[in-house]
Amino acid sequence: DPVDIGKKAAEKTLRRLNPRKVKSAHVPVILDPRVSASIVGHLSGAINGSGIARGTSFLLDAMGSEVFAPHINIIDDPHRKRGLRSKPFDAEGVANQKRHLIENGVLKTWIMDLRSARQLGLKSTGNASRGAGSLPGPSTTNPI
């Protein structure tokens, strides 16, 4: 309904008028799903095995370190029921599994395909994906 959309847009605009500074504090925050998806997308890029192997990730030396608040857990679940990218194997035929990327705020793993795993001296995590005309590369499946 165009009228309803207009009303919601006006309400959002009015709420942003007359901003004011607030004192610094530790407070709980609720993020819009789009913002959360963006944060997870940036995390996925930062823990991508290719970037780690090239030395270009800002999380290069963060394995085992707290990179989020202690109550944050991010899981990549390639077997999630009705997940858009659910599959038993990655694009290179490597079996995949549900894996904690972030557990209690701590970085637990890189996402790797065979190539990046070989470059890092590690095993593939079964996270290779590919497009129709591209080589495989590391990618998350269904991050939650």
Please report, for each region that a protein language model flagged, where it lies by residue:
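N-terminal small-residue-enriched
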Residues: D1-I144
